[in-house]
Amino acid sequence: MSPSSSSPHAFRAIDVIRKKRDAIELSGEEIEGLVNGYTKGDIPDYQVSAWLMAVVLRGMTRPETAALTDAMLHSGEVLDLSSLRARKVDKHSTGGVGDKTSLVLAPLAAAAGVAVPMISGRGLGHTGGTLDKLEAIPGFNVNLPVVEFRRLLEVCGCAMIGQTAEIAPADRKLYALRDVTGTVESPYLICASIMSKKLAEGIDALVLDVKTGSGAFMKSEKDAAFLAELMVETGERMGKEVVALITDMDQPLGNMIGNALEVVEVVEVLRGAGPEDLRELCLELAGWMLHLGGVAKSVTEGKEKSARLIASGQALERFRQMVELQGGDPLIIDHANRLPKAQHTMQVQTNKSGYLGSMQCEHIGTACVILGGGRERKEDSVDPAVGIILHKKVGDRVDIGEPIATIYYNSEPKAERARQLVVASCEISESAPSKKRTLVHRVIGKSAGAD
């Protein structure tokens, strides 16, 4: 109902703002009225800004969070994928540096018989975006209409596209407002934003990769676990099977950061090679996707099946098929030189010998953004060729003059700024770290004991 209605029971945004300000629980109808009114343009930015700040300061109950997610979800189209016989499972990461697991997981799970309708995003802040990585593949089209998206799922079992205008329009409006009103960080608003988009895909189950550490948005494990529990419970309230893995982002995942470079590393993993940490996390997440997708009785069986699909080449062939169906050049899989390539390289060396004790992972991500691999402003275009290859991981021995990284660049001033950040991000200590951080810290969800 329009807020200007003269009915004695008319919805009034100011009443909802006051209740949230005073920490009084809102009903589902009140939250729905606010979301619908704002999406239609009946409620102005300044009132919704006030409500968002009240949410940041007062928080939300679990029923309120679920109601907000539901209202945002139903502000647009919810895909009907019931014609697909396979169970529909997606994976979502909260964002990290070098996090290219989606490009491995979609074809890998599809090769196992799970349908993967993946609607992804672009880079945010210091973190890379799945769409930017895919668009490093010449010709790859992420802007497919829903009809074509559904057709690709039937043919290939997986498809990876960007958010369409029809999906969760309330989220697009609310996110743009949060971005300029200091209200991005609320776990309740983050949960509703993520879950409304994911549930609009028409999925049966969802695997969440919630990052924690210096390169994550959630720096502490406590904050990451709170967000994970919130998203799992919200999804379960809406009838979906959801599991969340709290995973480490104190150093970049894999060795390559930058869009075209990360595609190279994805192909390496799908060939059964690539960095150990990236392979390990991909198999862990794939194990969960296959288990929730009903093609593996346990996560362990799902991991074993995934490893066999990689070893046999079936996962790589499914990736090749997806690339070709979405207009990309499939020859990049066997000829990496067909991917965009930077004109210059620069070695990054340390002036101290010892062990790589820790890494400010966010700085590495920011260095890649500075090179042009991400956006410093919303209107910036991304250079797919630039990036960083790390030659050392935390705990490795480092000697003076030995390269710890190579920068791939097209602008020397940007490369020098990036070099300084990479050097500053690496702490060299006299002794090796006492213990190696585990990649998966915790698993949250009703299915968490499915190993």
Which sequence ranges carry the predicted segments?
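Acidic, glycine/proline-rich low-complexity segments that act as flexible tails and inter-domain linkers
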Residues: 2-98, 269-270, 318-326, 439, ...
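Short beta-strand segments
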Residues: 119, 153, 161-164, 194, ...
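A glycine-rich helix N-cap at a beta->alpha junction
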Residues: 133-159, 229-235, 239
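Alpha-helix C-terminal capping segments
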Residues: 57, 103-117, 197-202, 237-238, ...
